[in-house]
Amino acid sequence: MMIEGLEKMLAKGVDNALLRFGLGKGYLDAGDAERAAEHLQRCVEQDPKYSAGWKLLGKARQAAGDLAGARQAWEQGLATAATHGDKQAEKEMTVFLRKLDRART
């Protein structure tokens, strides 16, 4: 239901980082990681300082099997979070990256 309303807003020409984040989260929660990643990519293109967008983009890419893409998103998000003092997002993405590293060995 939430996705439907957000898609209607997008179709009417409303497009911003928060809307794209909502769509990305909705699609990820619904199990459509690839579509989620598309919206989250647009989210961080529109607001590169949005560390939560980078964090969720990494999760969506990971869920879609794109581990290199997940790493890239989390590394970018980590730099963004550190620059803007978003300590919680910084901690979470550091943990996600460590888990990716452990999975490779």
From Swiss-Prot:
First and last residues of every TPR repeat: 17-50, 52-84
Keyword Repeat recorded: yes
Alphabetical UniProt keywords: Repeat, TPR repeat
Record flagged with keyword Repeat: yes
Record field: transmembrane: none
Database matches in Pfam families: TPR_19 (PF14559)
Matches recorded under SUPFAM superfamilies: TPR-like
Protein's UniProt name: TPR repeat-containing protein PA0015
